[in-house]
């Protein structure tokens, strides 16, 4: 086992990465190794998908499957070894079908890629784990060195984050052939074990640029189906009655669940990254979308244990449900998996609803505590002139984007302390689950404009980017000249690709934490600092002073 893709990876003087019987996330060495084998299988599939396009063959099943299966290897998504192997077998079957189509048109059709003809050696998981050793991401570390390995992993993990957003967009009916062709090109190239530093750096920026397009179609998918988010108050306390909790990012799953629970007497609560759903008109029209429950994903083993109903996980993040003894009432959907728990392959939530009706639910309603969400792209752009007016009248000094992933590390208290230390004449724009560090606090307003503005899920960084570009255009300056600072927390691969997206767009002087990615070497950090001004958090006082004086 070697996995260094998330923020909580093991860090020692000898090196970084989880490499024992189990990773810090709870992933076993077996599952981790089989994920390496799956990734190699998907790289081979992409190599042939790219070749097939030369013959005018575009297989939509391949295009939809490839990023979805890659998404299953993202942190805290799928811990189920047999399902990982199933994805690998499906990748190989799709690859062979594509290969046959190409060779029917051209008998000499071939792909020069070391994983283009990969086959699984056995049905036995132990045999497959041994085969996976040939595809361990650090297998040639001694030959290429830590810097090249770090850049490879930056590209691989960044592309994995983009694949997750591609799947979210595809579920909502969004497809762009140019994006998928670019995805296959990059994925196939990474399967050749590239070792050129400049090429890898260029690739990382290409992934960031591609992801901007992915976020654009995801935004289109969400707003076309569910309307543009508008500011909405959400109760974060319990309401008496039967209940279901839904977590993750998949708004379509939430919509289907709301439709199927309507009139049943079962209330639906959002959790984690599902919180922004309350801002969408077509979702909040369901009156039994009753509120939001819990805090950051890392607290779920305590909070889920206390929730008196079933829980549906639509995407990341799931962690061991046996710890809180709620494994009999947690349900996984789509690419999510945990051994031994119920899995919903389709969109029928009937068994979940039945379970909810059989459980006690909340015995009484708590005193409501309302927070405001729903500052989507359209709302943010509508406020652009107000922001400019406040700045011109010196009522608004600075905007801080404080957001990103949450996690368990104690140093993450930095982000709570930073938000509460922001001066009263400054605004906080937030997104993703990092907001749970401070989103239940009262920050007041500036002439009626809330000082805490919740822009949505992690992918809604797109809205923040569009706002920044709009403000810069209206003020006749560059984005980096705005009174705007980005203070980002990271945990997994979606955050990595958001960072690459921002860097590829030329955004500079981003502050990130609580630690640097484990695959970043000092040399890579120095390059990113020199080129983009990217740096790690220090202390709240020092960072605040530096950002306000920039």
From Swiss-Prot:
Keywords carried by this UniProt record: 2Fe-2S, Cytoplasm, Iron, Iron-sulfur, Metal-binding, Oxidoreductase
Binding site for hybrid [4Fe-2O-2S] cluster: 249, 273, 317, 405, 433, 458, 492, 494
Subcellular location: Cytoplasm
Binding-site residues for [2Fe-2S] cluster, renumbered to this chain: 3, 6, 18, 25
Protein purpose: Catalyzes the reduction of hydroxylamine to form NH(3) and H(2)O.
Family statement drawn from the similarity comment of this UniProt entry: Belongs to the HCP family.
Name of the protein in question: Hydroxylamine reductase
Source organism per UniProt: Klebsiella pneumoniae (strain 342)
Top-level taxonomy: Bacteria, Pseudomonadati, Pseudomonadota, Gammaproteobacteria, Enterobacterales
């Amino acid at each position: 086992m070697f996995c260094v893709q998330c923020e909580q990876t093991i860090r020692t003087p000898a090196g970084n990465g989880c490499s024992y019987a189990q990773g810090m996330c709870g992933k076993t060495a077996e599952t981790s190794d089989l994920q390496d084998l799956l990734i190699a299988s998907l790289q081979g599939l992409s190599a042939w998908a790219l070749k097939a396009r030369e013959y005018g063959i575009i297989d939509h099943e391949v295009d939809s499957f490839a990023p979805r299966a890659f998404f299953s290897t993202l942190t805290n998504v799928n811990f189920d070894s047999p399902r990982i192997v199933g994805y690998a077998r499906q990748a190989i079957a799709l690859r062979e079908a594509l290969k046959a189509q190409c060779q029917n048109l051209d008998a000499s059709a071939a792909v020069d890629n070391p994983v283009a003809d990969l086959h699984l050696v056995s049905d036995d998981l132990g045999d497959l784990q041994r085969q996976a050793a040939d595809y361990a991401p650090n297998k040639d570390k001694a030959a290429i060195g830590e810097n090249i390995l770090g850049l490879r992993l930056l590209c691989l993990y960044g592309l994995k984050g983009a694949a997750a957003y591609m799947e979210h967009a595809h579920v909502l009916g969004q497809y762009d052939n140019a994006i998928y062709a670019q995805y296959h090109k990059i994925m196939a190239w990474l399967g050749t074990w590239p070792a050129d530093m400049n090429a890898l750096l260029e690739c990382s920026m290409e992934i960031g640029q591609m992801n901007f397009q992915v976020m654009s179609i995801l935004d289109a998918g969400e707003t076309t189906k569910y309307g543009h988010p508008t500011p909405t108050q959400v109760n974060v306390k319990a309401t008496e009655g039967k209940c279901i909790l839904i977590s993750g990012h998949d708004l379509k799953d939430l919509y289907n669940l709301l439709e199927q629970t309507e009139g049943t007497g079962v209330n639906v609560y959002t959790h984690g990254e599902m919180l922004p759903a309350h801002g969408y008109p077509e979702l909040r029209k369901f009156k039994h979308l009753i509120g939001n429950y819990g805090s950051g994903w890392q607290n779920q083993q305590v909070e889920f244990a206390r929730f008196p109903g079933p829980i549906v996980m639509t995407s990341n993040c799931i962690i061991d449900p046996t710890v809180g003894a709620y494994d009999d009432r947690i349900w996984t959907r789509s690419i999510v998996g945990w051994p031994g728990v119920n899995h919903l392959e389709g969109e029928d939530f009937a068994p979940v609803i039945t379970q909810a009706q059989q459980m006690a639910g909340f015995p009484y309603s708590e005193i409501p505590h309302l927070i405001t969400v729903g500052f989507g792209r359209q709302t943010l752009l509508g406020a652009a002139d107000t922001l400019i007016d406040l700045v011109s009248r010196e009522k608004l000094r600075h905007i801080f984007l404080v957001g990103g992933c949450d996690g368990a590390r104690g140093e993450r208290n930095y982000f709570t302390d930073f938000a509460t230390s922001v001066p009263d004449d400054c605004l906080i724009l937030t997104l993703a689950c990092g907001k749970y560090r401070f989103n239940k606090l009262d920050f007041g307003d500036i002439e009626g404009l809330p000082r805490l503005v919740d822009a949505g899920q992690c992918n809604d960084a797109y809205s923040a980017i569009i706002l920044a570009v709009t403000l810069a255009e209206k003020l006749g300056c560059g984005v980096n000249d705005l009174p705007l600072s980005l203070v980002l927390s990271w945990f997994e691969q979606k955050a990595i690709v958001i960072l690459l997206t921002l860097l590829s767009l030329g955004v500079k002087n981003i502050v990130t934490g609580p630690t640097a990615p484990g695959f970043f070497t000092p040399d890579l950090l120095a390059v990113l600092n020199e080129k983009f001004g990217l740096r790690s958090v220090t202390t709240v006082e020092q960072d605040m002073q530096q950002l306000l004086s920039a």
